[in-house]
């Protein structure tokens, strides 16, 4: 695959607008109006480096021992075959040669971790980030790959001479590392397989319903902790295996600390200014040898997310979040013997998985109109240059306009979000607004969970608010534990009111500017964003249509569907799982007790794994003769992972908002039944009594 040759470190800025043509060659400006639009089909096929849920510290990339090459995994969805294609890619860090696909294949490997006392949680739907491991000589990669449901270790030649499995066991391999060019250490949990087999045997007599069950994700007991990790060493030449020594285990378990670095005899780390306050600012601390720690008092030393030491130059480099509501990322350079950092780069986009290579960082980078790609960032000048773009063709499409919004909400909290407008938007035109939640850092794809296609919605004529949830009021207060803070946030749904008020403040701001029609506002959400949808429809009159990816926020879902283990844990965090829907806690969020006073058309696009939790609220709305539709996608999880389903969700979301906010329909014959149902819902709505106004 060829790497991108487009020299476009970032989009062109005109005031606060990011132009749709920021990454087009100059010769393309004349033809921009003829460029094709970004459709759901285009969006769903964009290739991804790593996983959709990557953070600044997610290890997306792997540098070769000599620093000349970088390896990473690329995933691309195909909605026609309903498959995700995985490629292991090697790219020269100097950009001189094209990237090489050293392996193509494998199945979608779900990200699962121990949580809530379960040995392995139910898949969220996000894929596991696969970080390949370089052999000491730099000739091969070792990495995890799943085929036919089994996770094995594969080895690939970095010259593209072939790849094959080298470690297979009766259990899934969970981690791997080289000890030398011919020896690998790997880990897994054979006890998990044994525990699953015991559950299968128990099923012959019938399972006792107990704390092992999580009904929302299945009717089968889950394996509980603890399950021991086993470490094995494989000799690739002889094929012999043995138990790993403690020293070898330490080699595998050792992971770099993103918030710790050495420069000479000075150790740099990050600590809170008040160790007893979980919300106290974090700041840089330097300790020379065995001396006393010295705290950096500069504002630039706070909110650090990554750091690297350069002993040759006697310099520390670090990334931090800064600016209004921490909406920017910045890179700083600081002499090791003087706590005076100097900023050398900043932007509103994202840098993820950065690795230092001599005087450069190699990072995965994305911005509002730029999907994730690889870039180099010069540690002296701050100049960013593209290294590898898995989606070079996106630049030929006609992209919407993006404006970064900043305001202080009615609670005094700094907020940022992004306004996305159609490519041909004319100033002064009022558009229907669709709100997509609840993170707006990086590429504006589909919001959290990637279900609400921002660019195609804008292309369809909507203004789109890519909403970034504000910090909670409680996060500015002193708490000694997350549980204590959570209880404060759930008290009277304090944080949910803060989110809803922020949404209303942004709607009012866009209304004052004449950008939107406040009578035609749609709201979407997944996970925590879905809770905001439920809360917003009950407690506000601002929303004319809504789409949610899960449902509902009520006593049944929190207590019954979460099972005894999780429901008990949720209660400790301030969620009243033992209170009925008509009690004071759930009255603000439950459709069951509020159905008669709602009137907003609601589309629920649920995974089959979660739809049972939607039935009480959905049924209450149906019985109250309210406009609601429930779509269930088979073999899906909290985040939908199948390309065909993602495309269907994209298209149905656009159709729903076009129908309710624009009074438009798609004439495609295969959608006739859909619109028959929706016209029946509209007729039902017109016959229903007026809803009770929100408080």
Swiss-Prot record:
<protein>
    <recommendedName>
        <fullName>Lasso peptide isopeptidase AtxE2</fullName>
        <ecNumber>3.4.-.-</ecNumber>
    </recommendedName>
</protein>
<feature type="disulfide bond">
    <location>
        <begin position="354"/>
        <end position="363"/>
    </location>
</feature>
<dbReference type="InterPro" id="IPR011042">
    <property type="entry name" value="6-blade_b-propeller_TolB-like"/>
</dbReference>
<keyword id="KW-0378">Hydrolase</keyword>
<feature type="disulfide bond">
    <location>
        <begin position="551"/>
        <end position="552"/>
    </location>
</feature>
<dbReference type="GO" id="GO:0006508">
    <property type="term" value="P:proteolysis"/>
</dbReference>
<feature type="signal peptide">
    <location>
        <begin position="1"/>
        <end position="30"/>
    </location>
</feature>
<dbReference type="Pfam" id="PF00326">
    <property type="entry name" value="Peptidase_S9"/>
</dbReference>
<keyword id="KW-0963">Cytoplasm</keyword>
<feature type="active site" description="Charge relay system">
    <location>
        <position position="638"/>
    </location>
</feature>
<keyword id="KW-1015">Disulfide bond</keyword>
<dbReference type="GO" id="GO:0005737">
    <property type="term" value="C:cytoplasm"/>
</dbReference>
<comment type="function">
    <text>Lasso peptide isopeptidase that specifically hydrolyzes Astexin-2 and Astexin-3, converting them to linear peptides. Has only a few specific contacts with substrates, because it recognizes Astexin knotted structure (principally the loop structure). Its binding to lasso peptides opens them to expose the isopeptide bonds for hydrolysis.</text>
</comment>
<keyword id="KW-0732">Signal</keyword>
<feature type="site" description="Important for activity. Binds to Astexin-3">
    <location>
        <position position="562"/>
    </location>
</feature>
<feature type="active site" description="Nucleophile">
    <location>
        <position position="527"/>
    </location>
</feature>
<feature type="site" description="Important for activity. Binds to Astexin-3">
    <location>
        <position position="116"/>
    </location>
</feature>
<feature type="site" description="Catalytically important residue that stabilizes the alkoxide intermediate. Moves to point toward the isopeptide bond">
    <location>
        <position position="438"/>
    </location>
</feature>
<feature type="disulfide bond">
    <location>
        <begin position="296"/>
        <end position="301"/>
    </location>
</feature>
<feature type="active site" description="Charge relay system">
    <location>
        <position position="610"/>
    </location>
</feature>
<dbReference type="InterPro" id="IPR029058">
    <property type="entry name" value="AB_hydrolase_fold"/>
</dbReference>
<dbReference type="InterPro" id="IPR053536">
    <property type="entry name" value="Lasso_peptide_isopeptidase"/>
</dbReference>
<dbReference type="InterPro" id="IPR001375">
    <property type="entry name" value="Peptidase_S9_cat"/>
</dbReference>
<dbReference type="GO" id="GO:0004252">
    <property type="term" value="F:serine-type endopeptidase activity"/>
</dbReference>
